[in-house]
Amino acid sequence: MKKRNAVISLIIMAALVAGLCYTAIVGLGADKSGSISKIHLGLDLAGGVSITYQAVGETAPSSEDMADTVYKLQKRVDQYSTEAQVYREGDDRVNIEIPGVSDANQILADLGRPGSLYFIRETDDDGNPNYGYMVTEEGSLGYGLTRTIEELDATGDIVLSGTDVANATAGYQSDSMNNRQIVVELVFTDEGGKKFAEATKRAYDQGETIGIYYDGGFISVPRVQSPITNGQAIITGEESIESAQNLASTIRIGGLKVELEELRSNVVGAQLGQTAIQTSLRAGIIGLALVMVFMIAIYFIPGLTASIALVIYTMLMIIILNAFDVTLTLPGIAGILLSIGMAVDANVIIFARIREELKTGASVQNATDTGYQKALSAIIDGNVTTLITAFVLMWLGTGSVKGFAQTLAIGILLSMLTALFITKFLMKIFYGIGFQDKKWYISSKALAEKKVEPIDFTGRKKIFFGISIAVILAGFIAMGVRGASGQGALNYSLDFVGGTSTDVTFNQDYSLTELEQQVVPVFESVTGDSNVQLQKVAGSNEVIIKTRTLELAERQELTQKLSEQFGIDESSIQAETISSTISSEMRRSTMIAVILALALVLLYIWLRFKDIRFGASSVIALAHDVLVTLTCYAILRVSVGSTFIACMLTIVGYSVNATIVIFDRIRENMQMRKPGEKMDDLVNMSVTQTLSRSLFTSLTTFIMVFILYIFGVASIRVFALPIMVGIVAGAYSSVCISGSLWLVLRGWFPPKHDDSGARPKQNKLKAKTDEEKRRLQEKRVWDKTLV
């Protein structure tokens, strides 16, 4: 690229970056489209309530009944928030999410009461109106009650209820003039038909209406044209078939016999959500800045281009979250910050390759092109395997775990875009501007190191294997001791055992003794149970208290007592309840997800490397990383909750990335293997050549997660700590174990032919003389002996 073109390209790129930053931070237009403030926040960030119901009864509900139930609940939650969502899960479950509400406990109470449908007489026996056209409580004109439902019921002015309606359907019918009209047809039960006959006779005689009242408001007030004695009625006058269908559905759901049981509920105070956002943003900014400083300090101009690409990556992530309306949760933020650390991985692989080429005497331009070419396969393989784990999470995960998987998958795809295209384009721009000397790409000391002395990793494999076995055994011993003492092998959260967890942020930092003396008695007085578990969150006033499953009334009483005795705002109290049904499903999903991810990774590596030994070695190394992380959970008593599956699969995806880079180098070096070179030496050289990549990538990702752990809220720390352990375990297994494992398996199951993964290119030149034929034949024979 010529200097003039490079300068123009740099100006365009600067304008592009500025535009992306403006869009992501400020937004476009009056509605600020694309800005970070417009991202749809999950309940753990926006505050609110979520609840999962399951239909119970002797017979399974029909699909129509469940659809009506969803419609019924959606109508009820719309009054709380325009962003409220109600959706089915499977055949018999309904999920409700209502963000940004203040009195979440009251909403839970309202949702717990079934919506009632009533048919009400227009006047009582004395001629007083039971309802009329008036200004409603919402300030609009419409029909409203003059007396309460209880008063109407006591005087007998409620003539039918929802259970008296057998069915309601919308359709078309011809009137007496043969005109097609929209109607709602009602069919009553036998008892309901008798009641309706009496009510319509009275209404017809007095020229009155019968109001149909549902869940706090009138849905229709039809005038009675004649006594209806056949148990069927027609309502006319609807403006559209859609409005008729809505009316029919509302009448049907008013008489639903579907009984709903609460499986899970979560109440998050708005203040807790705001704190989580602020701390996570702070962690992201600090972590990103540290990674950028590290990259520039280590890699000079390439590090600068990677830093610019990281800024572009971050801004694009914000814009994409807006464009696809992805709901951002706390684990989702963790996924973004983790993917920022992982985005550095591709750049580190490329820059390490570029430096290797520079050491051979190649020019900066040639070294850059060759570096990108040689790094491509490792980058693709590593990112595909990480995507596999993300897709498994999206498939088997629920709620916040699925949000984590979505942001992680988006981050992986964006990281490939920025590393393979944007960073390379920036490298060409800086080269064209004038940064053509090798000193801008590699230190003189590193450039002088022409030969890399291999480290004998395989010779120390017994030591490395022994360390790993000892750590894993320590974890199993800890689980056994804890289990025998009745504490539980692992510190299972509600997601795995069920119960109620109350997260309280006090106005001061109480000691554990003070909590046991002052707070525990409050919980015991409400629960009537002495089994109350306390967990202080280090560095904050936050305390997590676990109890048996609490009913809604008990949760409300507990919130009131905590607020009165400790002066806590209700927005600082978060409660979550999970049934044993959900917890057993969570345990099963976790096992399936981990096993499925390992199997898919094994299959991909086997197909990609055409060597089952590479795949088996990778899976064993991944199992090692998972078990070491499990040791962390066992010894440090880290809470095993809904993010456990996300944590384990993240470690699987991240660790296999590092292992693939080493295996890719082994495969490459086998194609250039020298006569008589021992396989141990080849493996040691391959691991040594990729050592800087393994260490630098692990360090940058560790920095991001460590900052997240330092500044994050409790739920983020529970996720970040095992991830840090997994990063260290993954780096250790990739460098110290994976190559030796492959070597051991190769010894146990020796190849029958050249299994390097790719054969050397054959010389396609035609020999013109006998001497040339002989030399060419010798070369082909020599190529075939490189096993």
Predicted stretch roles:
Residues 1-787:
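A structural signal for conserved, well-ordered secondary-structure elements
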